[in-house]
Amino acid sequence: ATLPKIGKLRIPLKERTGFVDLLPQAKSYMQNPNFAGRVEFRFELFQEEIDMNDLADFVLGKSVEYRDKPGKNGTVHTIIEFITKKSAAEFYAFIQEKEPFFDEVFLLSGTILEPRRREIINELKNPLSRKKNILLITTQVVEAGVDIDMDLGFKNISLIDSDEQLAGRVNRNACKVGCEVYLFRLDNASVLYGKDKRYQMVREQISVGEYERILREKDFGCLYELVFEKINWMNEQTYVQNFRSGFLRFVEGLDFQQVDRNFQVIEQQNETVFVPIPLPVEVDSMTEGVKERLFSDRELQFLEDFGVVPCEGLLDGKEVWEVYERLVYRDHPAKFDLEEKVGFKIMQRILSCFTFSLVGYSKELQELKGGTGEEKLGYFYLSHWEDEGVNGKLYDYKMGLNNRALKDITFI
């Protein structure tokens, strides 16, 4: 809903490429009350920074207020999104110290493994969960294709269209009234989005009132017109003229090797961390009494062929990794071997359940490399995940990577 009309960019091509709107009257849909009126954005916390303790009190207060409204079922599902995993974990700790209100508090960040992620989403989608007060503490991972329906939302402001994405997880089916999303200032969004033209335009040219209007009227085209103006201006400058004389020539000549060398869409490089933790073979599904399998019969049979079987419903990550090593180090046929290729594909799918990604230059990855594991076979193997210090274990199935534990655990 928030994607720009990139056909408005002035790209110096010999032939103008036509861009077709899949919905020519898209604005009429976006401004329909069933879409635009599902959620009311609130700006009480928008202009002044708030500290973590006051934010926790505010979230609790509004959640209690929603639960007690006439016509509600006496419970509330609240979601709060932070820019950083660190802030999400800190907020979790603050909430635990408050007077108990929520029956369940879930943490969903980029270091939570896929089985736990599915466990959380299934719980939120289970109709019986509507009998509980639930708080979901998350990061931007919740913005991409997570089909949940919450009652109240809170979000650290970042990008306007990102704010709208979070709102898409509140009153998703437009069946409730009184659903709100509160935007607050805690972490500086420039840490993640400082180079993003959308973020720059908001800071330089969009007032608080205009920010509110764009979200209220779903007029994201207004923002992208400013962004396109900036990009078009940059494209006219001498320092990007090599686009016309160099890069464009490679594209027109279908010289894909040169295109690959000269064009990079995503600058940051991620590293994949493997956690050799025991994982459940199945978790509760969104239907009460029914289990969802995390590994297929074929995947479990593949592991069994190497002598690895689940024990008490858990699959040992250390044993899974040893299977991967055996696959890599065994003798490979000189010719193409379909069975071997299929085996590696199955193995990659299994490995993905035990992994998460970190930005290559991030502080937490550099700290992990200070003795918590080793780099091997394309992964960072987190061998010390169970080590525990004053601030808890380095890695926990429900909490993900514990940054605070990195400070007080001595690794050998």
Language model regions located:
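Interdomain hinge/linker at the junction between the two RecA-like core domains of SF2 helicases
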Residues: 2-66
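Catalytic core segments in nucleotide and nucleic-acid processing enzymes
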Residues: 28-31, 99-100, 111-112, 132
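C-terminal helicase lobe and adjacent C-terminal extensions/tails of nucleic-acid helicase motors
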Residues: 49-81, 86, 90-118, 126, ...
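Aromatic/His-enriched, Gly/Pro-containing loop or helix-boundary segments
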Residues: 123
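Conserved two-lobed SF2 helicase motor
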Residues: 127-143
